[in-house]
Amino acid sequence: MARYFRRRKFCRFTSEGVVEIDYKDIVTLKNYITESGKIVPSRITGTSARYQRQLARAIKRARYLSLLPYTDLHQ
């Protein structure tokens, strides 16, 4: 039987030494939301708990300021 090697997930923000996630950095935030607009959980992305909280806060702020959509485009 073939065994599949699961790659260990790592926190991108920890490795890059990010101090705080900015809500104005839309390019980064878009990588952490689904096509339907939901925030991707940390067990999928590998983000640490500290940065997951900052990420959620930044996404919610960006949504409130209409920088990011709450849902998909409904096309």
Curated annotation (Swiss-Prot):
Superkingdom of this protein's organism: Bacteria
Keywords carried by this UniProt record: Ribonucleoprotein, Ribosomal protein, RNA-binding, rRNA-binding
Molecular function GO terms recorded: small ribosomal subunit rRNA binding; structural constituent of ribosome
Record's GO cellular component terms: cytosolic small ribosomal subunit
Keyword Phosphoprotein carried by entry: no
Biological process annotations from GO: translation
Keyword rRNA-binding appears in the UniProt entry: yes
Gene3D superfamilies: Ribosomal protein S18 (4.10.640.10)
Subunit structure: Part of the 30S ribosomal subunit. Forms a tight heterodimer with protein bS6.
Cited function: Binds as a heterodimer with protein bS6 to the central domain of the 16S rRNA, where it helps stabilize the platform of the 30S subunit.
Family in the record: Belongs to the bacterial ribosomal protein bS18 family.
PANTHER family the record matches: 30S RIBOSOMAL PROTEIN S18 (PTHR13479), SMALL RIBOSOMAL SUBUNIT PROTEIN BS18M (PTHR13479:SF40)
HAMAP family: Ribosomal_bS18 (MF_00270)
Listed name of the protein: Small ribosomal subunit protein bS18
Species of origin: Shewanella frigidimarina (strain NCIMB 400)
Lineage: Bacteria, Pseudomonadati, Pseudomonadota, Gammaproteobacteria, Alteromonadales
